[in-house]
UniProtKB/Swiss-Prot annotation:
One of its GO terms (molecular function) is DNA binding. Interacts with TRNP1; may regulate TRNP1 proteasomal degradation. Component of the SNF/SWI transcription factor complexes. Interacts with RAB6A. Interacts with STAT3 and FER. Interacts with TCEB1. It comes from Homo sapiens. The modification Phosphothreonine is found at T929. It is found in: Cytoplasm; Nucleus; Golgi apparatus membrane. Residues 51-70, 139-158 have a biased composition (Polar residues). The Elongin BC complex binding domain is also known as BC-box with the consensus [APST]-L-x(3)-C-x(3)-[AILV]. One of its GO terms (biological process) is epithelial cell apoptotic process. This is TATA element modulatory factor. The gene is TMF1.
């Protein structure tokens, strides 16, 4: 455990804490005012454990609090709307390291006096704070400042990122960590409230107390806190919402942000202007917090890659939820008091993105607190997770972010451990280097893309929610302004009505006065008349003159008064008219304002509905994200299986690749044949289609020519018939006029004859006979004329019948023409169907062209890829060839050297054998000592040379292939030869020769393998060049296909034009036929009328 230096870590944590505190004070511009007030805190611990410092909480108590003290709900004071919660600094290093270190190791950690200065917010009297804390904590021992009213009720216990890091690096700490997590997951551990002081903390006592009572605290917490939701059911909904877990950072310290809590009754009780002012203040404070967080996070985390996403999430969460909370307080009327506390710190864990809440296992049911929190709050909990690689730097940024607590949607409740594990597994596998196969990576990337897409959607939805909430706030402000204007207009209208009443009263009084004046004037006139009458009777005198002057003066005064009154009346009437106009304008304004108010209310309702819809959509998205996380888990399991399968498949793949190469060759041949056949089939189909189109166009032209000829003949016949009809009508009219004239003349003659006859009968009876004869003659002429008339009528009727027959023939011709028209229409419809087929074929060809283009692009890409691979293979081949040549030259040189050495050794061995034989031949004698000494000296020299050669050979073998089995260090070769070691040396040399020969064979085999690879590469090169040639041929064919497509388009357009012309001609023919029919009908009607008349 040399790497785990607790003192260094604690000092680093203290430095990070001090830096974070300085950055907070710098951002929030906190001056060091009244440190004694903030130093005072409540001793909140176990009775058995004595706190080392009287003014602060012992850090051991946050782990053991629930053994002795029941948690009480927070009691809100109705005096202040915003109540800032104390920001506490938790030195968790000693409690955190107690899980890993022994008490002796823990004692080395120095004392960490960590004091946090709160932001200087609205200060209240200490007595109220004392009373509120006495009610909330049931402890009346010491006082607290005004910011300690709201307490952290339910917060989930989170494992810091360094525990995971330590677990991965050392097996001991990993085992302990797993044991603790398993114990806490088997128990029903709900959210644990963390209470921490801000004063100086004695580390030694806390470490001992925590190490002794770590297991007892957890069991007691499970029992005490499991009973809390039953007691909290009577409370309000917002007071029962669980606060998010206090996150434990990597350095072992955490800061809970400043929280502003709104009291509902005080918001409702105050006026609209004050509510607007409060909302603007809260918005400005929220904006300041967000900007400070952005500055600090940007400065503190320069290496954090995904900081932008983190900032977006935090900004969207903070701003949207704050606006929603403010708007809900300003709009809704709540009867009960409720104070919601939210710790906006996010949780940090592991190397990747991970969240480790210690919670109930997936097999055990969920705790009651989670169910009650989910049932009553109905708000979705979100947690932001930051990697622990930059945990120390991030901590300074996070500690400096006083996030506004008015966020009901960012409540982090305790979630089941399987969900946390899914997030851990997912993000850990994202951060790990990609060692798996490309298929698994593609599946992972798809899942990541879907998650990122959903996150982007969520961000967009949150931004929309933000804009809608801002618009809602603006609309509410406008609504309040309009209400104020309404009240002002009502007051003005009431004042105007009062003025109107006053002026009407004045006018009535003036009218009464005018009426009285008129009456007085009338009376005065009567009196003047009477006086004048009296004066006329009496004599003129000075008295009458005086009386008249007085009366004139009275009359003038009355007239002046009447003029003044009339002027006043005019002025009053003008004022009344103006007031009425103003009243009408005010009424119009009031109506307009009412309409605006109604519209704004409707918009508000619509925006509320939209917000509800967006919330539902968000819920759906979160559910989808959960489902995707589960899917990711399944896919990861499948990945593990697939990796095993992949290993098996790779082995199979190697065996199949040889078969695939041959199959590829066959496939290329088949593709070539298929391409040739396809091109032939396409050409044949195109030729057939072109022939069919030409035939259809010829048939159309023929049909059009026949229709034109028939139309011309019909038009000629119609013209002839019209001329004949006109001639017959003219002749008949002439004959009728002539006959009428003759009938008139005859009737005149008859009348004259009758007159004469009467005269003659009266005058002379004798002259009657010739007259009678004349009459008879006249009657005979009349009969002849009538008979001639009848003949004429018969002729006319015959002619009428002929004309009718001609008409019937014309009707039959018309029917034939209509039938031909119908046939033409049928042909046109068939042409249209053919045209549609041609269009479909054209679209199909276009689709085929696009597919061919896509194929071409793909083939070009493949060609480029193959070319790149070819170049790489060529480079590799050249390199391998050069390497093999170099190795070959080296081996050849080594072989030659070895052969030379072997030859030298053989010569030396033969020389030694000869010397040994000579020595054996010579007998040992005393006289031969000088020769012996000489030979021994010679042999010693030779042996020394041999020894040096052997040593050099040993060194060369050491450098090249290995040490020789025989070493001649410290021994004379002559002695070795004398002892019979020459044969062993020769054997060693022979074995070395065999080794060298084996190496030569191995190198030759390698050369053969390389030549085989070269041949394979050459074959692949040939294949790729063939594919490239084919692709180039296809590319050359593309312009031909394009020209064919253009021709087809032109033909299609010409066919469409012809079709339009034919349709127009058919319509013209139909109109002409209708005109002819109408003409025939009118002529027949005229003839029938004439025949009837």
């Amino acid at each position: 455990m040399s790497w785990f230096n607790a003192s260094q870590l604690s000092s680093f944590a203290k430095q990070a804490l001090s830096q974070a505190q300085k950055s907070i004070d710098r951002v929030l511009d906190i001056q060091e005012e009244e440190p004694s007030i903030w130093a005072e805190t409540i001793p909140y611990g176990e009775p058995g454990i004595s706190s080392p410092v009287s003014g602060g909480w012992d850090t051991s108590t946050w782990g053991l609090k629930s053994n002795t003290e029941p948690q009480s709900p927070p009691i809100a004071s109705p005096k202040a709307i915003t109540k800032p919660v104390r920001r506490t600094v938790v030195d968790e290093s000693e409690n955190f390291f107690s899980a890993f270190l022994s008490p002796t190791d823990v004692q080395t950690i120095q004392k960490s006096p960590v004091v946090s200065k709160p932001p200087a917010k609205s200060q209240r009297p200490e007595e109220e704070v004392k009373s509120s804390l006495h009610e909330s904590l049931h402890i009346g021992q010491s006082r607290t400042p005004e910011t300690t009213e709201s307490q952290v009720k339910d917060s989930s216990l989170c494992v810091s990122g360094e525990t995971l890091a330590a677990g991965t690096s050392s097996p001991k700490t990993e085992g302990k960590h797993e044991e603790t997590v398993n114990k806490e997951s088997d128990m029903k551990v709900p959210t644990v409230s963390l209470k921490v002081s801000e004063s100086v903390i004695d580390v030694k006592t806390t470490m001992e107390s925590i190490s002794n009572t770590s297991t007892q605290s957890l069991t007691a917490e499970t029992k005490d806190i499991a009973l809390e939701p039953k007691e909290q059911k009577h409370e309000d909904r917002q007071s029962n919402t669980p606060s998010p877990p206090v996150s434990t950072f990597s350095s072992g310290t955490s800061t809970t942000s400043d929280i502003e809590v709104l009291d509902h009754e005080s918001v409702i009780s105050e006026s609209s202007a004050s509510s607007r002012q409060e909302t603007t203040d809260s918005k400005s404070s929220l904006h300041l917090m967000q900007t400070s967080f952005q500055l600090l996070s940007a400065s503190a985390c320069p290496e954090y890659n995904r900081l932008d996403d983190f900032q977006k999430l935090t900004e969207s969460c903070c701003s949207s939820d704050a606006f929603e909370r403010i708007d809900s307080f300003s709009v809704q009327s709540l009867d009960s008091r409720s104070v919601s506390e939210i710790n906006s710190d996010d949780e940090l864990s592991g190397k990747g993105y991970a969240l480790v809440p210690i919670i109930v296992n997936s097999s055990t049911p969920k705790s009651k607190t989670v169910e009650s929190a989910e049932g009553k709050s109905e708000e979705v909990n979100e947690t932001l997770v930051i990697p622990t690689e930059e945990a120390e730097m991030e901590e300074s940024g996070r500690s400096a972010t006083p996030v506004n607590c008015e966020q009901p949607d960012i409540l982090v409740s305790s979630t089941p451990i399987n969900e946390g594990q899914t997030v851990l597994d997912k993000v850990a596998e994202q951060c790990e280097p990609a060692e798996s196969q490309p298929e698994a990576l593609s599946e992972k990337e798809d899942v990541c893309k879907t998650v990122e897409f959903l996150n982007e959607k969520l961000e967009k939805r949150e931004a929309q929610l933000l804009s809608l909430s801002k618009e809602k706030a603006l609309l509410e402000e406008a609504f309040d302004n309009l209400k104020d204007e309404m009240f002002r207009v009502k007051e003005e209208s009431s004042s105007i009505s009062s003025l109107k009443d006053e002026f009407t009263q004045r006018i009535a009084e003036a009218e009464k006065k005018v009426q009285l004046a008129c009456k007085e004037r009338d009376a005065a006139k009567k009196e003047i008349k009477n006086i004048k009458e009296e004066l006329a009777t009496r004599l003129n005198s000075s008295e009458t003159a005086d009386l008249l002057k007085e009366k004139d003066e009275q009359i003038r005064g009355l007239m002046e008064e009447g003029e003044k009154l009339s002027k006043q009346q005019l002025h009053n009437s003008n004022i009344i008219k103006k007031l009425r106009a103003k009243d009408k304008e005010n009424e119009n304004m009031v109506a307009k304002l009412n309409k605006k108010v109604k519209e704004l209310e409707e918009e508000l309702q619509h925006l509320k509905q939209v917000l509800d819809g967006k919330e539902e959509v968000e819920k759906q998205h979160r559910e989808n994200i959960k489902k995707l996380n589960s899917m990711v888990e399944r896919q990861e399991k499948d990945l593990g299986r697939l990796q095993v399968d992949m290993d098996e498949l790779e082995e199979k793949n190697r065996s199949i690749q040889a078969a695939l190469d041959s199959a590829y060759k066959e496939l290329t041949d088949l593709h070539k044949a298929n391409a040739a056949k396809d091109s032939e089939a396409q050409e044949a189909a195109l030729s057939r289609e072109m022939k069919a189109k030409e035939e259809l166009s010829a048939a159309l032209e023929k049909a059009q020519e026949e229709a034109r000829q028939q139309q011309e003949t019909l038009a000629i016949q119609v013209g002839d018939l019209r001329l004949a009809l006109q001639r017959t009508e003219q002749a008949a009219a002439r004959k009728e006029d002539y006959l009428r004239h003759e009938i008139g003349e005859l009737q005149q003659r008859l009348q004259e004859a009758e007159n004469r006859n009467q005269e003659l009968s009266q005058s002379v009876s004798s002259t009657t006979r010739p007259l009678l004869r004349q009459i008879e003659n006249l009657q005979a002429t009349l009969g002849s004329q009538t008979s001639s008339w009848e003949k004429l009528e018969k002729n006319l009727s015959d002619r009428l019948g002929e004309s009718q027959t001609l008409l019937a023939a014309a009707v039959e011709r018309e029917r034939a023409a209509t039938e031909e028209l119908l046939a033409n229409k049928i042909q046109m419809s068939s042409m249209e169907s053919q045209n549609s087929l041609l269009r479909q074929e054209n679209s199909r060809f276009q689709a085929q062209l696009e597919s061919e283009k896509n194929r071409l692009c793909k083939l070009e890409d493949e060609n480029n890829r193959y070319q790149v691979e070819l170049e790489n293979l060529k480079d590799e081949y050249v390199r391998t060839l050069e390497e093999t040549r170099k190795e070959k030259t080296l081996l050849n040189s080594q072989l030659e050297m070895e052969r030379m050495k072997v030859e030298q050794e053989r010569k030396k061995a033969i020389f030694t054998q000869e010397t040994i034989k000579e020595k054996e031949r010579k007998p040992f004698s005393v006289s031969s000592t000088p020769t012996m000494s000489r030979s021994s000296s010679i042999s010693g020299v030779d042996m020394a040379g041999l020894q040096t050669s052997f040593l050099s050979q040993d060194e060369s073998h050491d450098h090249s292939f290995g040490p020789m089995p025989i070493s001649a260090n410290g021994s004379n070769l002559y002695d070795a030869v004398r002892m019979g070691a020459g044969s062993s040396i020769i054997e060693n040399l022979q074995s070395q020769l065999k080794l060298r020969e084996g190496e030569i064979t191995h190198l030759q085999l390698e050369i053969g393998n390389l030549e085989k690879t070269r041949s394979i590469m050459a074959e692949e090169l040939v294949k790729l060049t063939n594919q490239n040639d084919e692709l180039e041929e296809k590319v050359k064919e593309i312009p031909k296909l394009r020209t064919q497509l253009r021709d087809l388009d032109q033909r299609y357009n010409t066919i469409l034009q012809m079709y339009g012309e034919k349709a127009e001609e058919a319509e013209e023919l139909r109109l002409d036929l209708e005109d002819v029919k109408n003409m025939y009908k009118t002529q027949i009607d005229e003839l029938l009328r004439q025949s009837l008349s």
